[in-house]
Design a protein with these regions (language model features):
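Face-selective signature of the C-terminal outer-membrane beta-barrel domain
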Residues: 1-94, 167-176, 201-206, 210-224
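Outer-membrane beta-barrel signature, preferentially recognizing the C-terminal barrel domain
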Residues: 11-13, 60-62, 95, 101, ...
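Residues on the lipid-exposed face of transmembrane beta-strands in outer-membrane beta-barrel proteins
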Residues: 18-24, 67-73, 104-108, 159-163, ...
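Outer-membrane beta-barrel channels and translocator barrels
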Residues: 25-29, 76-80, 109-113, 154, ...
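Gram-negative outer-membrane beta-barrel transporters
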Residues: 74-78, 171-181, 195-277
Length: 343
């Protein structure tokens, strides 16, 4: 259940997923081929409390079948190529799709300390259980699956470089642009529901620099840039939002001990600007800047059985006004939280 002031969204869904994969490897070629099927059956209930209680129920059904094959080729002159093709068949309440998705990626190592990467690929967003799949999720190091609106179709274009400056200093840059066709249900002039699509564009850039002066200490600095724009439907579940720009700086320090204990402290400095359409009376834009401090204490179990971690998020209980583009997996928590994980 997800709640806002005056209403609740309640979901009751049953999901089934099955996947099969075949692996082939020779001296210069490795091949991953497979198929999958996903089925969702359930209902969403929107409960209103003001001015009087009532609810709206919507049946949800989603069928998604896919096939794929990825070939990784070891080419001369330290070049590795990726060529792939996938197909998606979708039958859902919102839209039906039949898509063929080419994949092309290349990595080149002109020197022992330098790696260049590039990729162009098409993909379709699926309603996966916890976003889990055994299909390759990266093409030349670029992520191809995101938590978008289900059945979204998008082309991605990426370029990046990873550099080893010395035995103790590493860095890199990456840029990825995604052009999306996002399905949604609209209302025609007669008041009847119709299937429609919105054009989204996402531009994401990142940079990192890590330094390990000694074997028990690591220092790092990361920068992330995100720019989201759309025309018709809201971003991040907030009506009227037509553009979001994020700048995020992440300094971090990590400590390690040979007995299996490790500790990490990191901060996020966030600068977000939001653009709204003419239907929002509060104004055309707003922004917020804030710091959030997090920490984790971990222990690696013997024989690599797993890692136990005590994690603290938003340690100083920082308040902020932030729209997350991934509501199911938010980057920042609005209040202090401490939890234990086992991986």
């Amino acid at each position: 259940a997800t709640g806002w002031d005056g209403l609740d969204l309640l979901t009751d869904n049953e999901r089934i997923i099955g996947e099969l994969q075949h692996l082939y490897k020779s001296d210069r070629i490795s091949l991953q081929s497979g198929a999958g099927y996903f089925y969702l059956d359930g209902k969403d209930r929107l409960v209103f409390y003001d001015p009087f209680p009532f609810e709206v129920e919507d049946k949800v059904e989603d069928k998604h079948a896919n096939l794929y094959s990825y070939a990784q080729l070891d080419l001369p002159h330290e070049v590795v190529g990726t060529i792939g093709l996938s197909g998606d068949l979708i039958d859902s309440n919102v839209t039906d799709r039949e898509e063929l998705n080419p994949k092309l990626g290349i990595t080149w190592q002109p020197a022992d300390s330098t790696l260049l990467r590039g990729a162009v690929f098409k993909a379709v967003t699926r309603s996966l259980i916890n976003s889990q799949t055994i299909e390759p999720t990266h093409v030349a190091g670029f992520n191809q699956f995101f938590r978008d609106v289900p059945a979204s179709v998008y082309w991605s274009y990426g370029i990046g470089v990873d550099q080893k400056f010395s035995q103790k200093v590493f860095g890199g840059l990456q840029f990825l642009q995604r052009d999306l066709d996002v399905p949604y249900q609209d209302i025609d002039d007669a008041g009847m529901p119709i299937s429609a699509e919105d054009d989204w564009r996402e531009q994401m850039a990142s940079a990192y620099l890590y330094w390990a002066p000694v074997n028990w200490l690591s220092l790092g600095l990361e920068y992330f840039y995100e720019d989201f724009s759309q025309e018709e439907i809201e971003i991040g579940g907030v009506p009227g939002t037509e553009g979001i720009t994020n700048h995020r700086l992440v300094p971090q320090v990590s400590f390690f001990h040979s007995c299996g204990f490790s500790a990490r402290v990191w901060a996020n400095y966030v600068d977000q600007k939001r653009e709204f359409n003419e239907f929002i009376p509060a104004g055309a834009s707003e922004s917020d800047q804030f710091w959030q401090i997090d920490a984790a204490l971990s222990y690696r179990l013997p024989k690599r059985y797993g890692i136990v971690s005590l994690v603290g998020k938003n340690l100083f209980n920082e308040e902020f006004n932030y729209i997350d583009t991934d509501q199911a997996n938010p980057k920042f928590l609005p209040e202090q939280q401490v939890f234990l994980t086992l991986t």
